[in-house]
Structures are given as structure tokens and as C-alpha cells.
């Protein structure tokens, strides 16, 4: 190959090969020690090149006159053939020019390196499954205790963590921006005090600065001092219990499961704490103000079996209610479709775009002012009975939503609503604000933020243990503009209060004395009387307001 080629040119070519090899090794150094040793052997062949090339300057210098070979690292040339004794003393790992030692190449261990961001970049850990299931354990039940006062079941205030992963619309925005635009129920001073108190965590690390920019998969946790509204002190009666199901007579005013501001004051928690009935599967649901038969399955298999019966229309549900006016004495069937106006407020209406529904009504009695009506829903839409009765012109007598003047002069009869959905919700909320009865809508002042109308958002996105609940539970109260007291200006003073105490220095709700709800605020005249299937039938006692001799106050 080299026959007829001058020796000097041959040496130059070999040197160029060694130089290219050096560049390759630096780029792909992780390929292993074997490759490095092979390239070093090749470089040894050009060991005397420096002395041959530099005198005539053909290839030993660049345009600046600096010898190229002097700038090569020993990892590229391997063992150099010594030109003099002082160069030979260093051996492998020596720089030819200054004698500084460079570590020899290290072979790849074969282990995958931990992902690191660029200098100064915040690395977000991968998401984790943080919930093992939907059931609640003794740890949850032990968060707080009940006490009873004035015919009400009350919950002692307690600390609670709202948790969520960063939502897509938050990515690239600072925490400060998110709080100031989406959680305006509290002033920024509250969140700043929460940072000082160690209440805000990002990926389980305390937030030090609200200016931190959120990334995808960021996990946020906010600790709040939680207050729950009172419910009736009426006990939950068991109608039946066996190896498959638990059946209760649910009192009015108690939600079935945690939602909004309610957690311990729910059927699920009361059954777990007071009856040791845990890991139950709700087979259907009742509105908070609705009373009557409520069924739970004890196993997933039983739950699936009964839900299959529901899909096959094998179950029969029967309700009783008291409605305004004289209901027709013949059977009435309503098939009007129902559309959700707002998941957050919990408002629906008849609309052609809604889901198909069917309810069968039959009057049972009339006392001259109101009627007791039997209701048999053949479908199971939200507020189906209440909306259909409103459409028929006979709303439930004390329905806080569908018997309201906010719907207009006809109160929604025949679907005539002379206002937009936005106007309807605004007027409905304003009416209850004036009566100081927002709790009838399962709202408080802190809920009255932009975005009240959210007809496209599923309710699960608005409630479950997430920062969405922050606007509900962070507690901004009427007339309180500053949620973070001035004496919390140091980390020591802002330290998290003892979890056993019922007051918290950051909590505005702790500084407000709220009136208890009146007895009439805890009841709606709608009762689930009977639940019947192919092999079971459960009936609850008829309430006092449904009797023929009942008279209005």
C-alpha cells in the first residue's frame, strides 16, 4: 500500500489517522476501554511523528503556529515513544508539554446513569401511584373526632392535605401566577405565609419561593386547616346487613361520600368510624338533602352484579315527595331530556340537548296547599325527579334550587327560563347570599370565584382531594381581607401549629363565628322509600312530612 510513497508523507497520513481517532474516542469514550486500547496501539505507530514533522512545519502547526500535537490529550495517543528522558518519566497519562497528569479512561460500568438536567435546571421526578384504592382506612378516620351540639353533628377542625399533579394549563407558569389567577379566594399574602409555614410542597420538598415555574408531572401538596359544615345529629339506622350488602336509612343533610367541604360528615366516614363498616361500594347515590334507602355492596363482585341489574333495568326505585300545589290525580309520565348547567353549583334543567330521562308520577294525597307524590324514575340522571317536577309546574315544596324565583316568574315551568345560564346561576347564588343560605347550594363565600359556570367539566375534576379544593377549603370569609396575620412574618412564628389544637394562626375560618343551620335547612321533602331487585326489597319508614295529616308551619 505504501510502496512508492515518501516516508515523510506516510508519517503525515498516519498522524492524521491518529488525530481522527483521538476525536472519535473523546466523543464516544463511553464505548469502553477495549476501543481505547486499540486506538492507543494505532497511535503508537506514529510515536516519532512529532520530531519528523515539526521541523518543516508541514503538518505540525495550525494557522496560529501552535503545534497541534501539543494540544492532544494522552487518551488519544496512548503511550508516547519518549524523545528524551524527562518525557519518559511520566509514561502513560502524561501531557507531553507540561507534564500534568490526566486520569486514564474509565470503562463504563454498564449501569444506566441517573437522569440529570442541565446546570441549574430543576428535575421533576416521574409520577407515582399515590393511591392504593378508593376506600378509606383507620388512618383517615382518625384525622379528627365528632361532637354533638344543638341537634347537630359537628367535626373538630383538622389539618388536611390537598394534592394534585400539575395540570396542563399550569405548565410554564409560576406558582404565584397560578394562585393569583385560579385561586383568588385568598390574597397572595395567605400563600406567602403558607410558604413560610411549610404548608406548600412541590415534589415533597417545601416551596421556598412562589416564583418557581411549574413543569409537567410536578406534584403539589397544600396543607390547610379544614372546617366542615355541621349535619343533623340524627343517627344512621341499618335496615339490613349480610355478607353481601349494607342497607341504611340515610338522614337528610348528610352527603353519601366525601365531596366539597364534607369529608368526615359523610355516610361513608360515619359508617366507618361508628359502625366499623369499611371498604363499602356505593350502589347508588342520594343528594345530600335527600333521605331514605341507600345500599352499599361489601365486595366488588356484588357491586358489579347489582350494577349489571341496573343496566338491565331489573331494579325498581320508588320515592315520595311533597310538591307545591295540587298535582294531577292521574298518572303523569315525564320524558323531558335533562342538561347539566353547572357541576360546581349542581344545577340542571330541561333542554333538548340533554340526556334522555323518564319519570312516572302518581299523586298520593293533597292537603289543600301541597301534594304528596309517588315518583318512579326509570332512568338515573342527576336531579331527575326534581327537574321533572319543576318542569311540570309542581316543584318540591322546599327545594332550595328548583323552587327558586331565580328561574323567573314561572319558576321554570314548561322549561320557560327567560335568562341565560350565566344569569340564572348569578341570580340563584345572589338569592341565597341574601338569605345567608349558600350552604343550601353546598357553597360558601370562597367558592364564588370566576369560573362558577363549568358545564363541560366533570364533577370529579372539581372535588377529589386536589388543589381544586383549595378554593373551597382555604377559607376566605366575608369581611376578612387579610388571611395571613402580620405576626407570621418569621419562619419560627409561622411554624405549623400543633395538629391536636382546633385553632390555627393561618386559618381565617378560625376567627369567624358562624351561625348553625336551622332545622328546616337540613331537610328537603324528597325520600327514597323503596329499592327492589330480583332477589331483594328494602323499604324505609315514611317521613313525617309525607303523612296525610301533615300541615305546613
UniProtKB/Swiss-Prot annotation:
Biological process (GO), any one: mRNA processing
Keywords assigned by UniProt, alphabetized: Isomerase, mRNA processing, Phosphoprotein
Gene Ontology MF terms: pseudouridine synthase activity; RNA binding
Modified residues (Phosphothreonine): 490
Record organism: Mus musculus
Residues annotated as the enzyme's active site: 287
Function: Pseudouridine synthase that catalyzes pseudouridylation of mRNAs.
Protein known as: Pseudouridylate synthase RPUSD2
E.C. designation(s): 5.4.99.-
Family: Belongs to the pseudouridine synthase RluA family.
Highest taxon of the lineage: Eukaryota
Amino acid at each position: 500500500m505504501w510502496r512508492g510513497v515518501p516516508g515523510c508523507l506516510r508519517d503525515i497520513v498516519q498522524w492524521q489517522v491518529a488525530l481522527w481517532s483521538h476525536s472519535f474516542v473523546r466523543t464516544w469514550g463511553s464505548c469502553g476501554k477495549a476501543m481505547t486500547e486499540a486506538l492507543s496501539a494505532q497511535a503508537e505507530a506514529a510515536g516519532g511523528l512529532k520530531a519528523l514533522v515539526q521541523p518543516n512545519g508541514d503538518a505540525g502547526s495550525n494557522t496560529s503556529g501552535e503545534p497541534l500535537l501539543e494540544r492532544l490529550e494522552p487518551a488519544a495517543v496512548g503511550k508516547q515513544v519518549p524523545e528524551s528522558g524527562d518525557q519518559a518519566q511520566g509514561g502513560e497519562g502524561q501531557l507531553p508539554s507540561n507534564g500534568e497528569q490526566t486520569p486514564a479512561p474509565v470503562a463504563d460500568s454498564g449501569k444506566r446513569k441517573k437522569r440529570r438536567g442541565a446546570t441549574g435546571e430543576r428535575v421533576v421526578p416521574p409520577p407515582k401511584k399515590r393511591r392504593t384504592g378508593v376506600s378509606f382506612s383507620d388512618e383517615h378516620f382518625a384525622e379528627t373526632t365528632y361532637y354533638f351540639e344543638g341537634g347537630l353533628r359537628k367535626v373538630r377542625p383538622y389539618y388536611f392535605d390537598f394534592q394534585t399533579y400539575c395540570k396542563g394549563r399550569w405548565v410554564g407558569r409560576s406558582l404565584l401566577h397560578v394562585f393569583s389567577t385560579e385561586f383568588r379566594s385568598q390574597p397572595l399574602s395567605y400563600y406567602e405565609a403558607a410558604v413560610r409555614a411549610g404548608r406548600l410542597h412541590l415534589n415533597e420538598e417545601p416551596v421556598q419561593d412562589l416564583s418557581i415555574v411549574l413543569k409537567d408531572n410536578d406534584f403539589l401538596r397544600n396543607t390547610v386547616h379544614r372546617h366542615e359544615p355541621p349535619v343533623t345529629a340524627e343517627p344512621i339506622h341499618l335496615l339490613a346487613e349480610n355478607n353481601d350488602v349494607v342497607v341504611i336509612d340515610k338522614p337528610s343533610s348528610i352527603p353519601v361520600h366525601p365531596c366539597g367541604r364534607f369529608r368526615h360528615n359523610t355516610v361513608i366516614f360515619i359508617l366507618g368510624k361508628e359502625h366499623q363498616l369499611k371498604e363499602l361500594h356505593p350502589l347508588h347515590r342520594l343528594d345530600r338533602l335527600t333521605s331514605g334507602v341507600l345500599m352499599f355492596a361489601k365486595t366488588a363482585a356484588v357491586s358489579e352484579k347489582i350494577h349489571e341489574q341496573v343496566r338491565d333495568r331489573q331494579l325498581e326505585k320508588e320515592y315520595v315527595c311533597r310538591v307545591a300545589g295540587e298535582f294531577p290525580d292521574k298518572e303523569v309520565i315525564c320524558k323531558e331530556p335533562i342538561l347539566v348547567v353547572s357541576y360546581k353549583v349542581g344545577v340542571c334543567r330541561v333542554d333538548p340537548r340533554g340526556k334522555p330521562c323518564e319519570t312516572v308520577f302518581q299523586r298520593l294525597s293533597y292537603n289543600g296547599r301541597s301534594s304528596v307524590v309517588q315518583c318512579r324514575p326509570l332512568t338515573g340522571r342527576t336531579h331527575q325527579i326534581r327537574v321533572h317536577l319543576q318542569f311540570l309546574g309542581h316543584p318540591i315544596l322546599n327545594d332550595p334550587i328548583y323552587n327558586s324565583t331565580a328561574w323567573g316568574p314561572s319558576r321554570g315551568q314548561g322549561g320557560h327560563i327567560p335568562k341565560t345560564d350565566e344569569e340564572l346561576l348569578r341570580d340563584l347564588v345572589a338569592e341565597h347570599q341574601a338569605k345567608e343560605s349558600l350552604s343550601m347550594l353546598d357553597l360558601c363565600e370562597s367558592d364564588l370565584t370566576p369560573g362558577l359556570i363549568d358545564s363541560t367539566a366533570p364533577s370529579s375534576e372539581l372535588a377529589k382531594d386536589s388543589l381544586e379544593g383549595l378554593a373551597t377549603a382555604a377559607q376566605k370569609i366575608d369581611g376578612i381581607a387579610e388571611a395571613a396575620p402580620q405576626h407570621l412574618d418569621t419562619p419560627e412564628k409561622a411554624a405549623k401549629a400543633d395538629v391536636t389544637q382546633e385553632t390555627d394562626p393561618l386559618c381565617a375560618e378560625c376567627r369567624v363565628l358562624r351561625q348553625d343551620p336551622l332545622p328546616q335547612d337540613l331537610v328537603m321533602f324528597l325520600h327514597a322509600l323503596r329499592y327492589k331487585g330480583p332477589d331483594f326489597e328494602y323499604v324505609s319508614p315514611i317521613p313525617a312530612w309525607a303523612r296525610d295529616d301533615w300541615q305546613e308551619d
